């Protein structure tokens, strides 16, 4: 018997709830996103649902249910125990240097595996994959080589479109809507390595606490969700950063400043990036030990990842470890090994 009538009836029920401003349960969100990510929803149904959720505001339960389906549909890759991810939603429109990508090399050099989930540029001139390509990393390397660099070199780049093939079903409606949707939040929650320790940057402060609660429901061990008061989806050095920490079943809210870990406060202009070639050159200089605003913000974000990894107890200790990894040339060596491994024939 065809499941089409059942699917149509469920979509009508869900769309009817969303149309009147009612929230979906986690189970209902799972059901509707299973239909969507399986290719069984029409473009009109997808667009209507996404816009309805956006206008009303997505709930913790809805985001959790949708993320569960994204994770279930992903092409998985096995990561070492204790791996972390440092990732942002994008969409902050700040056009900064590739902060979390640079921080990934530093964290790996400190002995913590990083399963870096990323994509091409969204609101900047250079996304993670763009700058890695400019650095010489083969982002389309065979999965065997990605696995090798993740396990042997402690950093691997997981190119989102390669792992989330089901996203093709929503590409058309998302593009036509031309506005942020729940999928802007789902990417950082859907690491195909299943990392349970994360630093997640968000484009708006209102998502800091809710996404920490989502990560908890999804099985996180230790996570920071961060938003710079300057608008960055990273920990910022221009002022305070709002943080929601999930650990041990609890969410704790606090702020951090660069000064409290011995870093200089920067001006927003100091953090601006350029195209992928410009950012790659800046990253090479940073990893060779060049001082300045780029280094400081990378150190701060690496420090947060070291905290959630359990490598250090305090952000200050993390900052000192990150600085040492750069100054000893260890972070630069991680990049060079990643370039070599990903360009080999598996």
UniProtKB/Swiss-Prot annotation:
Metabolic or biological pathway, per its Swiss-Prot or TrEMBL entry: Amino-acid biosynthesis; L-tryptophan biosynthesis; L-tryptophan from chorismate: step 2/5
Residues that hold anthranilate 2 according to the record: 174
SUPFAM superfamilies: Nucleoside phosphorylase/phosphoribosyltransferase catalytic domain (SSF52418), Nucleoside phosphorylase/phosphoribosyltransferase N-terminal domain (SSF47648)
Residues noted as binding anthranilate 1 in the record, renumbered to the chain: 88, 119
Residues the record lists as binding Mg(2+) 1: 100, 234
An individual GO BP term: L-tryptophan biosynthetic process
Family: Belongs to the anthranilate phosphoribosyltransferase family.
Protein name: Anthranilate phosphoribosyltransferase
Species the sequence originates in: Paramagnetospirillum magneticum (strain ATCC 700264 / AMB-1)
């Amino acid at each position: 018997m065809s499941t089409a009538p059942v699917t149509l009836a469920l979509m009508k029920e869900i769309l009817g709830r969303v149309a009147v401003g009612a929230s979906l349960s986690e189970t209902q969100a799972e059901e509707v996103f299973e239909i969507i990510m399986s290719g069984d929803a029409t473009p009109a149904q997808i667009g209507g649902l996404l816009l309805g959720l956006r206008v009303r505001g997505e709930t913790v339960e809805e985001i959790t249910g949708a993320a569960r389906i994204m994770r279930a549909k992903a092409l998985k890759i096995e990561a070492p125990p204790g791996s972390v991810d440092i990732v942002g939603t994008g969409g902050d429109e700040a056009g900064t240097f590739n902060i979390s990508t640079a921080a990934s090399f530093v964290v790996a050099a400190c002995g913590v595996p990083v399963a870096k989930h990323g994509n091409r540029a969204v609101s900047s001139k250079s996304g993670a994959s763009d700058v890695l390509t400019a650095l010489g990393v083969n982002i389309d390397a065979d999965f065997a080589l990605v696995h090798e660099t993740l396990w042997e070199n402690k950093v691997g780049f997981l190119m989102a479109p390669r792992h989330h093939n089901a996203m093709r079903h929503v590409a058309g409606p998302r593009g036509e809507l031309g506005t942020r949707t729940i999928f802007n939040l789902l990417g950082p929650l859907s690491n195909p390595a299943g990392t349970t320790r994360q630093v997640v940057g968000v484009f708006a402060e209102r998502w800091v606490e809710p996404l920490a609660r989502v990560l908890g429901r999804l099985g996180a061990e230790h996570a920071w969700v961060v938003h710079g008061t300057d608008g960055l989806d990273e920990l910022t050095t221009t002022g305070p950063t709002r943080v929601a920490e999930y650990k041990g079943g609890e969410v704790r809210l606090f702020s951090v400043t660069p000064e409290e870990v011995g870093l200089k406060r920067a001006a927003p202009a100091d953090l601006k990036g350029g195209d992928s070639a410009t950012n790659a050159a800046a990253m090479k200089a940073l990893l060779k030990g060049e001082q300045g605003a780029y280094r400081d913000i990378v150190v701060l974000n690496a420090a947060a990842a070291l905290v959630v990894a359990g490598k250090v107890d305090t952000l200050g200790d993390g900052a000192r470890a990150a600085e040492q990894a750069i100054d000893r040339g260890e972070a630069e060596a991680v990049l060079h090994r990643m370039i070599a491994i990903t360009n080999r024939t598996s």
